[in-house]
Amino acid sequence: MSGLADRALLYTLFISIPTISYLATFPFFSTIVKYRSNYSPKRIELDQEGNRSHPVAGVNSYFAMMKRVKQLEGQAGFYKGIVPCSLLLAFLRSIPVLIRAGIIVIRKRDLWHSLAIALFSEIVVLPIRVITFRAMTTPYRLPWYNPIFSLRTLLSVTERKHPWLLFLTPGLLVSVVLSIVHGTLVMSLLKTLSFPVATRYPLARSSPTQLGIYLIASIVSVLISCPLSVVQVRLSIQRNHPPRDYEIIEREGQAESSGVVYSGAEEDVVSLRSEGDPYKGFFDCIRRIVNEEGYSRLLCAWWFDLVFLWYSGLIMPWLQSFF
């Protein structure tokens, strides 16, 4: 009986510890998506109807966005999008398990096969990732018990009629592919150079020179991955509409938002770019962000990615060495 009790306790800890960690860290990732999606032009411009845009004032840092979410939406605002994000992580985490179990057979495990698996996985879950980002940034309150209503709020009429358009969002697939290629090549480079940081005990087996090179390489990597992440968030939250007049798009948006409840009682947490003048592609998104918001916007909260990279590459393996 004691063996059965010990096993039950072990299984409980195995499930509860990752769950608690996930719930504790989710608000930080939710805030980074909100911060990178926030449209903050250097000057106020008129839209096609002659109305002035109203960017969120005072949100010029990651922690300012976190404070704003807390003030306007409360704790619930930090957990927007947790349901689709959980489905996304469950799918991505299941792939290595299926490979180890032999359900998914991979004859060769070289760079190209790893890249192909990563690309296939990300393309499959692309709609869920889009829905997750939109759920995190929407000004509306999404009920947990009514996914149909939430999807109707997050997706445009055109996207609900033609779901495959999510894959064809201008520039989105390019940003996803570049992010996967970049991440796969970085890990392959570390293993090729035989860095102990790519092993289970990085801090114990790394020389100061190796750690220094790794830290510099990770900074360069973040300078590439951060702009890709910003572009991916911006393109994901941009809904697809047919090429019609701006007034028709506005009426469609009003019809879609009927019956919804705003999360913030006073104002929107995130200032989103007008859907009447969308980004036309990957490079157009970069060009407009630079022209309208400045180069620094492409690197907003770059330190967040760097801390996460160091944590997953150095600190986490070091902590695992004690168990």
Predicted regions and their residues:
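Matrix-facing interhelical linker segments
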Residues: M1-F323
